[in-house]
């Protein structure tokens, strides 16, 4: 069987693989074959993912996630920023004038590791995002309330949401 490719920077690999080595290495511990194939990526350097639909180039950028970092991704003029409470200065230039931004908005009140709705809306406006989809929303962000009260260029996401983009 073919392993599922996963893309990890050095820091993520250092933390993840020792905990889940049985997923990456044919195992003495588990007796099962490995299911994941590590592909090492470097922050702020593009990498290409190939699939049945062709190739897509991704650029990983650094985000703040409380006292640790997380990685956001930009591809074409789209960014994905989950598990984020702030951005490192080096990452900011990748956020301007996006066509789409899929971005964290956990709840109404501030949280130590996830951005809250007001902050997310400020970023969307500041960076002049054309269309944003909120993700990682907690139960206190009511979907219908958000539909009625968000700016026209911002929508709450939902499970199985999909939309077409030109690549």
Where are these regions (language model features)?
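Active-site HxH/HxHxD metal-binding segment of metal-dependent hydrolases
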Residues: 1-29
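Short active-site oxyanion
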Residues: 2-5, 77, 129-131
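A short helix-to-beta-strand connector/capping loop
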Residues: 2-3, 29-37, 53-56, 150-153
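Short, well-ordered alpha-helix to beta-strand connector turns
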Residues: 3, 35, 76, 97-99, ...
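Small/polar loops that bind or transfer phosphate-bearing groups
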Residues: 8, 82-83, 134-135
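Active-site/binding-pocket entry motifs
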Residues: 22, 64-66, 107-108
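Core dinuclear metal-dependent hydrolase active-site scaffold
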Residues: 34-90, 159-167
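Binuclear metal-ion centers of metallo-dependent hydrolases, dominated by the metallo-beta-lactamase
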Residues: 44, 88-167
């Amino acid at each position: 069987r073919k392993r599922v490719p996963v893309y990890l920077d050095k820091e993520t690999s250092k933390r993840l693989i020792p905990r889940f080595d049985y997923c990456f290495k044919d195992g003495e511990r588990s007796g099962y074959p490995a299911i994941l194939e590590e592909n090492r990526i470097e922050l702020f350097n593009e990498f290409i993912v190939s699939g049945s639909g062709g190739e897509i180039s991704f650029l990983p950028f650094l985000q703040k996630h409380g006292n640790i970092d997380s990685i956001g991704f930009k591809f074409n003029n789209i960014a994905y920023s989950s598990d984020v409470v702030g951005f490192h200065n080096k990452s900011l230039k990748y956020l301007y004038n996006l066509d789409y931004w899929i971005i964290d908005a956990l709840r109404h009140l501030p949280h130590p590791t996830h951005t809250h709705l007001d902050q997310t809306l400020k970023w969307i406006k500041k960076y002049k995002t054309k269309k944003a989809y909120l993700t990682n929303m907690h139960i206190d962000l009511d979907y219908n309330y958000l539909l009625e009260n968000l700016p026209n260029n911002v929508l709450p996401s939902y499970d199985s949401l999909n939309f077409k983009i030109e690549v």
